[in-house]
Design a protein with these regions (language model features):
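Active-site neighborhoods and metal-handling regions in enzymes and metal-associated proteins
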Residues: 1-464
Length: 464
């Protein structure tokens, strides 16, 4: 596979003023509750306890459309019982966005410090657990953020990432033997409910990817030598939609090594490294590379980094598909890109995404996780080779079979047109021959600008 660079008309797109915050129909959430309770029944569990806070909201949000913002919340589910949601002072009013009937209980310990604590606060948990029928013979599945595996502890299935005071209170009722970590119900690569999306969820992620990629493109197009990181970050033109992570902008080699550094006062210089990462909720787009227009200075970088890195991305995109395992993708990349091991790639070459930026990854050499219909995936390979600039392309996509594609096209025709345009650009301009089931969410999907001061040049597969 020969790699070249081609000149294109600089990409330009209108800004979209549409919110990624969507509350679905009641039936959607109730169906999800039914599915997760079916998983609980198979495990012999009587109740599910789902915890959320500002950072770890996605599992609760999946069942309610609600996130607790700067407070905490606890959802309790059981067969044949109305769901019960424990909330802080400010969450009680906000939770009225939930579109179906459930019991909401004020638990002021989930509020911020210094706010009102009524005398009966001490009794709230006991009463709530009793209302939901939790008793010594109950078996509880606890869902926080992570599940654990044997490599992390001999008692991995009773390792919990919920606050200790909640776990302790439940343990007083059912003992430790009556509890199990079942966050895997949500994000296990093989069966987790949030690892595959329906047509409406895909539409949200496509919208988020569109808005995010256009912000990143706007950022790149406005860069000029001498601009500071914090000034340049304003080029993202962020609206009020919730973000998936803090925006990353830095212009120094040290900043690249730090990876997640927020923008500071460093100024952009020609021939320096430029790094940007940004995402609205359910999306992330990132670019790292050289800010230069003088390619003659960087023949070594072209030969030893840019060409093999882009070739690796082409292999990644052309290999993924429904039924392909993540292990197959990794093994093919390592087999065909001898530079892989010297690129300093410390994380999985790709991962799954939902409302949170990284739910789990199927891209591992140790397990055979098949890519499935409805999966939302981040193409995300971070290279940090010694003696060369960092390199990072990250964009999101989904896999959809013919039926799911037809449903999406019918229900979301404008989004489908954007996807079709991106697919054509990847195949015709970049030379990346993706499969029919690959639905790109980013307007700069696979676009590698080798010289970031000139966005009219992109890398491509040489068709000759």
């Amino acid at each position: 596979m020969n790699i070249t660079q081609v000149r294109i008309e600089p990409l330009q797109f209108e800004r979209l003023h549409e919110s990624v915050v969507k509350v679905f129909a009641p039936e959607t959430y109730l169906s999800r509750i039914e599915k997760v309770l079916a998983l609980a029944k198979k495990e012999g569990l009587t109740h599910l306890i789902i915890y959320a806070d500002r950072e770890h909201f996605a599992n609760l949000h999946y069942f309610t459309g609600f996130d607790p913002r700067f407070e905490e919340a606890l959802l309790i589910l059981a067969p044949d019982k109305k769901p019960l949601l424990l909330l802080g002072n400010e969450g009680v009013l906000y939770a009225t966005i939930i579109p179906y009937d459930l019991d909401m209980v004020l638990f002021q310990s989930f509020s911020l410090n210094g706010q009102q604590r009524d005398p009966e606060t001490i009794e709230v948990l006991d009463k709530a657990f009793n209302q939901m029928g939790i008793k010594p013979t109950s078996r509880l599945g606890l869902i926080g953020w992570k599940y654990f595996i044997p490599a992390e502890g001999k008692t991995y299935d009773t390792m919990f990432d919920l606050p200790h005071f909640l776990v302790e209170k439940l343990e007083q009722i059912v003992t430790l033997k009556g509890m199990k970590n079942v966050a895997s119900f949500m994000v296990d690569p093989s069966f987790g409910l949030r690892t595959t999306l329906d047509v409406d969820e895909i539409a949200v992620l496509e919208l988020a990817g569109t808005k995010t990629s256009r912000s990143v493109l706007n950022f790149l197009s406005k860069l000029k030598p001498g601009v500071s990181e914090i000034e340049a970050s304003s080029y993202l033109e962020i609206d009020g939609d919730p973000l998936i992570a803090h925006p990353v902008v830095n212009f120094t080699a040290e900043g690249i090594r730090q990876g997640l550094a927020s923008p500071g006062s460093h100024k952009l210089q020609l021939d320096s490294v430029c790094n940007v990462g940004f995402g609205y909720r359910s999306s992330m787009v990132a670019r790292t590379g050289l800010y230069t227009s003088d390619s003659a200075k960087f023949k070594k970088v072209w030969d030893e980094l840019l060409v093999p890195y882009f070739r690796m991305m082409v292999i990644w995109y052309e290999t993924i598909g429904i039924g392909v395992t993540g292990k197959t993708v990794v093994e093919r990349i390592k087999r065909e890109i001898p530079e892989f091991d010297s690129f300093g790639i410390g994380l999985n070459p790709g991962h799954l995404i939902h409302n949170d930026e990284w739910t789990t990854s199927v891209f591992t050499e140790t397990d055979d996780f098949p890519l499935r219909n409805g999966m939302a995936i981040q193409s995300d390979i971070i290279a940090a080779p010694v003696g060369l600039p960092g390199m990072h392309l990250e964009d999101g996509l989904a896999l959809a079979d013919s039926q799911l594609r037809a449903n999406f096209k019918e229900k979301y025709p404008e989004a489908w047109q954007r996807i079709e345009r991106r697919r054509n650009f990847m195949k015709e301009v970049l030379g990346i021959q993706i499969k029919d089931e690959v639905l790109p969410f980013s307007d700069i999907q696979g676009c590698m600008f080798p010289w970031m001061a000139d966005l009219g040049i992109v890398m491509a597969v040489d068709k000759k």
